[in-house]
């Protein structure tokens, strides 16, 4: 229910000094209209969202310049950015790193300021679990299963994931390697994820770790694995930037599932519908045998472009600094933390 204060503010927005185009935009989007009225009625100094690709939040940041609006990136962004460029124009974006900034700029996104601070989730994980995990598993499959995602919206992801899961399961069975699965679904869809897995593998032969965001269960099982394998999951890119051995796989010609902007012959990429099980196995043999120090030497220049993890401050500390500065009225300008 709308408070009287918000209703009065909505009337003021329509009858006040805003231009005709702005008033038309508000009438056309009632939710935007209500949110702007709510913000206007409480006059905040800072407005933050963890939904970085929200068109409404971008619009609000332009319609209400008196506050510091900050969108915090919550997932990896690929070539789909070009399709959203028309509305990705938030005034301040806290992003994973250089790849995100370059992708947004090259796609024509009118973002006011980029703060390349890394991944907030990854930072919270590293703060809670600062010690390097002891390796318990040879391989980890990073699940990206979500019921609607696989059945309706991303059939290519479903195809890639099934192919990858079957290849990896067979490889581990043949080579005597241990396999863990980092679950994707939260408790409300856990049963469906388990049913999906049982269609393609024998779950009694693997260690399945359900996704528990509060305990960072997926992050932990990835760090406890010698090699993690995924299609293009955000948590995979985070682990890759922490120095983990991660292999990204796309068994189609669809660039949506590629690691963007990177030559496909890299040791951490498997790509193409022509990839055979034999080729897949040879790649995994090579990655598994590499020492971590050698792996990091081969990958970290690229990895840090995706998710910055090398700065002295954790992402949450950088975020606190930005918000504290905005609360004190000291607005920063330009791109930070390059």
Where are these regions (language model features)?
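Donor nucleotide-activated moiety binding/catalytic core segment of transferases
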Residues: 37, 184-242
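Catalytic binding pocket for nucleotide-activated donors in carbohydrate/polymer assembly enzymes
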Residues: 90, 111, 116, 234-309
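Conserved catalytic-core segment of nucleotide-activated headgroup transferases in glycan assembly
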Residues: 122-199
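C-terminal alpha-helical cap of glycosyltransferases
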Residues: 300-338
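Short, charged/polar "capping" segments at the starts of alpha-helices
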Residues: 5, 56-58, 100-104, 124-125, ...
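Active-site and donor-binding regions of nucleotide-sugar-utilizing enzymes
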Residues: 1-124, 236
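Structural motif
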Residues: 1-2, 45-53, 73-74, 92, 96-98, 138, 178, ...
